[in-house]
Amino acid sequence: MENIKLLVAMHKAYCLPEDAVYAPIQVGGVHIPGMENALRDDTGENISNKNRSYCELTALYWGWKNLQADYLGLVHYRRYFARRMPGGRKFDRIASGTEIHAALEKAPVILPKKRNYWIETTYTQYIHAHYKEDLDAVQSILAEKYAAYLPAYAAVMGRTSGHRFNMFVMRRDILDAYCTWMFDVLAEAEKRIDADRYDAYNGRVYGFLAERLLDVWMETNHIAYTELPVVFLENQHWLKKGTAFLSRKIRYRRP
């Protein structure tokens, strides 16, 4: 069986699946009690000091630069790929290594099922929740450095659904190509976005942008993928999220 590793980005203690396919990694330079032997994103070649704005991508960068695996993936300590089974304890729904391997026999990439915003496009949802200037910067970067990606970018921005959460599993050669492109776009975006003026939430700007860039890269490069459901280990408070979603849409005033 191929060597498959899914990094579990963590910044605090939390219950973890025991399956060997999962590799917890402490992000942002934190030291979690009881996890002294876990991976850390501030060792080797890293961008750990950017965790505030890059979120779980600092774990991805570390894995890309420092971890040898035939397939490498990224999940979050509160959300995982799930097996296809109704009901039961949320923790028991986390996909096993065997199930991840079976999914990879169908395609070289696993993505989470698409999130649908229904009444918002990817573009309008972003500018209502964050800052339009972020997307303006990305579009300019693509136009200047990666013009072949502009058609997919326009298509993705115009859709009401997309793959979110910065969750995926990729064959190593595909991951190398994706990370090379994505981190270059984000590095260029850092030169153009003044994230220091953002609050803590919007300061996670490069993590948010990467969520929207994944589909752009996948489509431009015609990468085959399969999807798995996502299990959230904590309650999602959908009513509260829905109310905030509509409130942002109604009150939007940014140019």
Q: Could you tell me what each predicted segment is?
A:
Residues M1-P255:
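ER/Golgi luminal nucleotide-sugar-dependent glycosyltransferases, focusing on the catalytic module
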